């Protein structure tokens, strides 16, 4: 999948789930499941409930996403 095929949203982490999964409430009031990106795992960036994050989603499945950035 090319970089142009992703859709970016902002949201808030509402719940931590097993296997490094998170429930994220987007700014448009949709809730999705998301996991952290590989660079965030490699650099051990912790994501906690209540954190503001950027989420990348594919247009083919709008219920799952990848957390790419955590705001301070």
UniProtKB/Swiss-Prot annotation:
It comes from the Bacteria. Gene3D superfamilies: Nucleic acid-binding proteins. Its main location: cytoplasm. InterPro entries: NA-bd_OB-fold, RNA-binding_domain_S1_IF1, S1_domain, TIF_IF1. NCBIfam families: infA (TIGR00008). Component of the 30S ribosomal translation pre-initiation complex which assembles on the 30S ribosome in the order IF-2 and IF-3, IF-1 and N-formylmethionyl-tRNA(fMet); mRNA recruitment can occur at any time during PIC assembly. This is Translation initiation factor IF-1. It comes from Paramagnetospirillum magneticum (strain ATCC 700264 / AMB-1) (Magnetospirillum magneticum).
